[in-house]
């Protein structure tokens, strides 16, 4: 999958990118702002966006999710902002809570990929940090 990462914490963004690339995914980004995320989404064919909610300490990830939805790009919130994620569940496929186990990200993406393509998700266990909103 081609996955857009929108995360303003550099170490988290790099760790996330590394895990996904090692699993064979193409990483777009990471982007740390609304503008950078949307620019990358327009420049590349993105299959999925992983979005931190609290970009720049302002909740800008919700704005990114709204714009990506208009572009028909599915998003998953990756954040410690549980209440905000649930309040905006209509904008995302789901939520991966921080902190998370890095291996759970790869497994979560496999589950999300199956859901997006109408396939049977990989066998359990589904990562505890993943919550689907559908």
Regions found by a protein language model. Give the residues of each.
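Hydrophobic/aromatic residues positioned on beta-strands within the core alpha/beta folds
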Residues: 76-78
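A Lys-centered signature of the CheY-like receiver
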Residues: 98
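Conserved two-component signaling phosphotransfer/partner-docking surface
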Residues: 101-106
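Acidic, metal-coordinating helix/loop segments flanking the phosphotransfer/catalytic sites
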Residues: 30-48
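Conserved acidic carboxylate
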Residues: 7
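Two-component/phosphorelay signaling modules centered on CheY-like receiver
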Residues: 10-29
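CheY-like receiver
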Residues: 116-134
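Conserved phosphotransfer microenvironments
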Residues: 52-69
């Amino acid at each position: 999958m081609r996955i857009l990462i929108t995360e303003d914490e550099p170490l988290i963004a790099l760790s996330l990118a590394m895990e996904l690339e090692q699993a064979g995914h193409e990483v777009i980004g990471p982007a740390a702002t609304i503008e950078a995320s949307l620019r990358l989404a327009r420049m590349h064919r993105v299959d999925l966006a992983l979005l931190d909610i609290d970009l720049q300490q302002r909740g800008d990830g919700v704005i990114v999710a709204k714009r990506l939805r208009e572009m028909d790009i599915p998003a998953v919130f990756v954040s410690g902002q549980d209440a905000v994620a649930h309040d905006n569940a209509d904008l995302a496929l789901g939520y991966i809570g921080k902190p998370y186990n890095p291996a759970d990200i790869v497994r979560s993406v496999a589950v999300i990929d199956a859901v997006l393509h109408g396939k049977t998700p990989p066998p359990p266990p589904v990562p505890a940090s993943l919550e689907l909103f559908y």
